[in-house]
Amino acid sequence: MTLDVSRQDPRYNTLKHGFNLRWPSTDAQAAGRIALCEKADDVAPALQHIIDTGMRPTVRSGGHCYEDFVSNNPDGAIVDLSLLNAPEVRADGTVRIPAGTQNWNGYLELYKRHNLTLPGGSCYSVGAGGHICGGGYGLLSRLQGLTVDWLSAVDIVTVDRQGRAAPRTVDATRDPELFRACRGAGGGNFGIITAYTFARLPEAPREVALATVAFDWAAMTPERFAELLRLYGEYWETRGKDPDTWGMFSLLKLTHRSAGQIVMLTQFCNPDGTCRDLSVLNDFLARFRACAPVPLKGRPPGYGPAHRQGVGQLLCSKPHTVVRYDWLTATQTVNGSGPNQRGKYKSAYMKRGFTAREAQRIYTHLTRTVPGIDLSQSLLQVDSYGGAVNKTERIADTAVPQRASVMKLQYQTYWTSAADDAGHLRWIGDFYRDVYGTPDVSAPHAGTPYPGDRYEGCYINYPDVDMLAYPFWPQLYYGDGDLYAFLQRVKRRYDPNNIFHHAMSVRP
């Protein structure tokens, strides 16, 4: 059964938007209706009705699309998959994860019933539908790879040239090109994914250590900041490539100066899923002594409401805090999504550590002010990357070409009032263009992390419509090889009428 939510429904004002409250940009830009599908079998008929009535369909699983690709849909309809949320392990051992499953619910179900996990994100409310097909990653990805690396089949509803919606299951032998496209090209391109199947999944770690360390902005000189970035990037470019470090994932949150502290969060386990030997973690943390680390004040940014050291074993408290947890408790501890606000995001993959010029430009923008604009929720988050992700054989059978990077960057800024939109967008835009300016990037590609010796482009699950200003934007997200041309062929075959489209969807 499909539940139809129209503008007259009391639920409409809540369901018309997702996580990013910038969208819909106005009430007139909002979708005319929301179709809440209760079962996977409801999706094709719901989609058929939308097509037959001349409406444009957009798709929502968890509602975390950063841009206006879903909620901005005037006179269109959102197909909402959030009720398709019950993972199952079948008799043959395969795991089926419906598209509406949110990260935390999926982790709970897989762990409690089967001691399994998926190397997905730490944001608890992100839905599997968009997360997985965009190449979703998380704190276990250096150890276990990307979510799409484990994928064995996809249930998807496509629309043929005659406008007929029909479900199909695709895998390495049935519609293999569409299957590959669903392994990283991102959502809203080829059809409506209703579920993912995994022939097997990794066991969850038995325990992990969570380390937090902070650096006071008040004591952060340009030189100390540059040294912090040099040490962090150098580690992942060198020592971080060794397999005994792959169980370690770090998030360096380079906050705006007005936030008070820079914070580094690190999760660690040995490759066997235990914390019996913490020498790798201790060596990593010790490298930052010259940067004047201090204990964290308050709750770490990005930690969920369950953050409480009392449930774990405190191993160290100064200058950094290290707590040993069972894996599920640790996952709950870091599973923050943050409040629903207005936001803007940008991304970059880095194949090498930071240069002095990059560090100087980052410092400049994190310490400058914009009159009348609160930047205390603005930051550049630098995630460790690589490890099991960088298995080059995955380039040929997934749609994720970035398999040589050692860090993954997400530029973020959050605010609450539409009146502040322009100030925040200008700040983050200037920041990004400056970091990737010449001479670090060749003139034709200046302002972007174009694939080359230092960078590997951008992440499609962090879409940024500003990149559309560059004619080479597909190469930023899909590499400068033949992947985008391949995706265009898949698009023409499986969505010949371009039913599924948005500003950054694959062009026919």
From Swiss-Prot:
A GO molecular-function descriptor: oxidoreductase activity
Names of the cofactor(s): FAD
Family: Belongs to the oxygen-dependent FAD-linked oxidoreductase family.
The name this protein goes by in its record: N-acetyl-D-hexosamine oxidase
Keywords: FAD, Flavoprotein, Oxidoreductase, Thioether bond
InterPro entries: BBE (IPR012951), FAD-bd_PCMH (IPR016166), FAD-bd_PCMH-like_sf (IPR036318), FAD-bd_PCMH_sub2 (IPR016169), FAD-linked_Oxidoreductase (IPR050416), Oxid_FAD_bind_N (IPR006094)
Catalytic activity: N-acetyl-D-glucosamine + O2 + H2O = N-acetyl-D-glucosaminate + H2O2 + H(+); N-acetyl-D-galactosamine + O2 + H2O = N-acetyl-D-galactosaminate + H2O2 + H(+); N-acetyl-D-glucosamine + O2 = N-acetyl-D-glucosamino-1,5-lactone + H2O2; N-acetyl-D-galactosamine + O2 = N-acetyl-D-galactosamino-1,5-lactone + H2O2
Domain FAD-binding PCMH-type, first and last residues per copy: 26-203
One Pfam family named in its UniProt record: BBE
Function: Catalyzes the oxidation of a range of monosaccharides in vitro, displaying the highest activity with N-acetylglucosamine (GlcNAc) and N-acetylgalactosamine (GalNAc), with a reduction of O2 to H2O2. Acts upon the C1 carbon of the GlcNAc or GalNAc molecule, producing the corresponding lactone, which can spontaneously hydrolyze. Its biological function is unclear, but its main function might be connected to extracellular production of hydrogen peroxide to compete with other organisms through oxidative stress, or support the action of peroxidases and peroxygenases.
Crosslink feature (6-(S-cysteinyl)-8alpha-(pros-histidyl)-FAD (His-Cys)) location: 64-123
Chain segments annotated as coiled-coil in the UniProt record: none
EC number: 1.1.3.29
